[in-house]
């Protein structure tokens, strides 16, 4: 048996209210690149399911930029580390790494000959640096600012010029190499932070945008101010991003006023204005004019493709998670995938396009801990002390069914739902609690097989109950585990029960007897166990970032290992078909794996 990666549903850009989001593209016009968590995401602009993730930063990433050749990416993080790595090989071989700043790197710019970089952000001694890419040696000084530098760019044509925008309201102009400060070209122009500066592709113009809603165009050779984009048509909120068209005549801007605009940089007039919703998450924090695709990123991290034919509605919105994905479920009848993340967001995925839709109505208010699918019902429970039974066809949340403490897991059989909180086991029918059983051993997980209900506890035991009508009656316990039970799952054939624990062990039970022994290949807590549709294999997911597939018919056989599946740990794993596995991880990604026997 072998397991190969098929597709990645990548996390969306990480966002912070009031701060720009950096999204950049490759020279070929195929892939975009952005930061999310401690990863860098490479994603095909036409097909979101085609993606790659760079995991090598030791902390939260902030920005990534392709070299003009397209052969390398330079990426930065909050600790001031700059990593330059190969894009042509799957392994992304590291070319160089430098400690450039003492604080977060916020923007990066390459010279068109691929030899030099300007790196800016926060720091104690300096807010920017100009370096040679292959040695890290200085090729100038980025000076003249008294506060954090938020943005930088380099003119693509010789003689090179560099520009920087800062929290001190200045746009500084540098000539070189070696780059040296010449002047503040925006003296008196901005009254708040300068969030983004960008040279036109031909280098003839520079556009700058600020938190004071203003935008200016300067001469790309001299830094002389040419025009202010029409104040009468300006955004009504701070501008966080700008990007040039390929024809050098138009610029796209993104604003906290929940709109994007296209401007004619010769006349200063607004040509198009794209409006979004009224929610705070509709604030636009970054944008990219990428070939024939106009992209904008909102506060929720969603990437919208703007539609020139309908300015009120994007032609496509790439949704996703930018927090850890804790639980997933697959609807075998419809072929849809469901996922929920740490921030309580719940998405339904179309696996043919990689696009997702939200449910409407009153959502959970805290992390969703479990998802199950029963026909048209989506059963969820969450840390907000509630269970919901929602309509899949209507894509609307159901009413909250309150429980006494954070809900840990749900399971169902027919019209019966069993949910466990940290204190109690609940039996739910028709959307109402019909019975509850106190549990002093803190339930953690639940599985149901017809009238047999198994509940895992922090006391290292599996408590087995018999369901009769609306009531649970204690039957027996299974106590071979030496750690708290973390997940339970009955086999589709109904003969076996799989369990995982915090002491890294997986056990398959046949009745009261353990069928498997010594399944302890994981090096950390088991987070999930799942059965293949034919009941022959069990997949386990762990905090150790590994997935193992165990052979139930041959328990002594070595399991198949999927190494380094997700950065920071695998939170859930499920089977789609016998030849397909879905996994969800701490980095916010969902991965689809092919399994071949």
Curated annotation (Swiss-Prot):
Record note on disruption phenotype: Impairment of growth, macropinocytosis, phagocytosis and movement. Prolonged cytokinesis with exaggerated cortical protrusions and production of multinucleate cells.
UniProt-annotated location(s): Cell projection, Phagocytic cup; Cell projection, Lamellipodium; Cytoplasm, Cell cortex
InterPro entries, per the entry: WD40/YVTN_repeat-like_dom_sf, WD40_repeat_CS, WD40_repeat_dom_sf, WD40_rpt
Effect annotated for changing residue 167 to A: No effect on binding to cofilin or F-actin but does not restore impaired chemotaxis or F-actin assembly in cells lacking nhe1
Chief location: other
Listed PROSITE patterns: WD_REPEATS_1, WD_REPEATS_2, WD_REPEATS_REGION
Spans of repeat WD: 56-95, 100-143, 144-186, 189-228, 234-273, 320-359, 363-397, 438-475, 480-517, 521-561, 566-596
Effect of residue 125 to A: No effect on binding to cofilin or F-actin but does not restore impaired chemotaxis or F-actin assembly in cells lacking nhe1
Keyword field: Actin-binding, Cell projection, Chemotaxis, Cytoplasm, Repeat, WD repeat
Entry keyword Repeat: yes
GO cellular component, one term: cell pole
Quaternary structure note: Interacts with cofilin and F-actin.
Function of the protein: Implicated in both actin filament depolymerization and polymerization. May enhance chemotaxis by promoting cofilin-dependent actin assembly at cell leading edges.
Protein name: Actin-interacting protein 1
Organism annotation: Dictyostelium discoideum
């Amino acid at each position: 048996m072998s397991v190969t990666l098929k597709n990645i549903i990548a996390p969306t850009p990480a966002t912070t209210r009031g701060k720009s989001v950096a999204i950049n593209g490759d020279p070929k016009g195929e892939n975009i690149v952005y930061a999310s968590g401690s990863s860098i995401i490479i994603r095909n602009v036409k097909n979101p399911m085609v993606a790659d993730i760079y995991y090598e930063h030791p902390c939260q990433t902030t920005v990534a930029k392709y070299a003009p050749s397209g052969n390398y990416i330079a990426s930065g993080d909050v600790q001031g580390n700059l990593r330059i790595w190969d894009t042509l090989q799957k392994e992304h071989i590291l070319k160089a790494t430098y400690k450039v700043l003492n604080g977060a790197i916020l923007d990066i710019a390459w010279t068109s000959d691929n030899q030099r970089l300007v790196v800016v952000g926060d720091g104690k001694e300096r807010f920017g640096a100009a370096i040679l890419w292959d040695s890290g040696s200085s090729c100038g000084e980025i000076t003249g600012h008294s506060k954090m530098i938020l943005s930088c760019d380099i003119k693509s044509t010789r003689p090179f010029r560099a520009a920087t925008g800062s929290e001190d309201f200045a746009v500084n102009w540098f000539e070189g190499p070696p780059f040296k400060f010449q002047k503040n070209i925006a003296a008196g122009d901005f009254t708040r932070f300068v969030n983004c500066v960008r040279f036109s592709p031909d280098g003839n113009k520079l556009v700058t945008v600020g938190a004071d809603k203003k935008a200016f165009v300067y001469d790309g050779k001299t830094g002389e101010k040419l025009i202010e984009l029409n104040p009468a048509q300006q955004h009504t909120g701070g501008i966080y991003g700008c990007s040039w068209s390929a024809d050098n005549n138009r610029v796209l801007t993104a604003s906290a006023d929940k709109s994007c605009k296209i401007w004619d940089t010769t006349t200063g007039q607004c040509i198009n204005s794209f409006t979004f919703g009224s929610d705070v998450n509709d604030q636009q924090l970054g944008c990219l004019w990428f070939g024939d695709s106009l992209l904008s990123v909102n506060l929720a991290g969603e990437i919208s493709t703007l539609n020139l034919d309908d300015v009120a509605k994007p032609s496509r919105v790439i949704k996703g998670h930018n927090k850890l994905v804790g639980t997933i479920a697959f609807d075998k009848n419809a072929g849809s995938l469901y996922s929920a993340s740490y921030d309580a967001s719940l998405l339904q995925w179309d696996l043919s396009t990689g696009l997702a839709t939200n449910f409407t109505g009153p959502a959970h208010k805290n992390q969703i801990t479990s998802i199950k699918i029963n026909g048209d019902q989506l059963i969820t429970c969450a840390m907000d002390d509630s269970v919901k039974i929602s309509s899949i066809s209507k894509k609307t949340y159901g009413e909250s069914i309150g429980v006494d403490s954070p809900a840990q897991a749900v399971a169902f059989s027919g019209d019966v739902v069993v949910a466990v909180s940290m204190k109690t086991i609940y039996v739910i029918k028709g959307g109402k609690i019909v019975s509850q059983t106190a549990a002093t051993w803190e339930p953690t997980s639940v599985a149901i097989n017809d009238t047999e209900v198994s509940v895992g506890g922090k006391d290292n035991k599996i408590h087995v109950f018999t369901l009769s009508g609306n009531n649970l009656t204690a039957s027996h316990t299974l106590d071979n585990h030496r750690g708290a039970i973390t997940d339970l799952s009955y086999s589709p054939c109904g003969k076996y029960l799989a369990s995982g624990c915090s002491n890294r062990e997986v056990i398959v039970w046949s009745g009261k007897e353990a069928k498997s022994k010594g399944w302890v290949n994981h090096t950390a807590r088991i987070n999930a166990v799942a059965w293949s549709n034919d009941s022959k294999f069990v997949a386990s997911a762990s905090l150790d970032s590994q997935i193992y597939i165990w052979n139930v018919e041959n328990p002594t056989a070595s399991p198949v290992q999927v190494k380094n599946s997700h950065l920071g740990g695998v939170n859930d794993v499920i089977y789609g078909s016998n030849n397909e596995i879905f996994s969800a991880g701490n980095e916010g990604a969902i991965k689809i794996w092919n399994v071949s026997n």
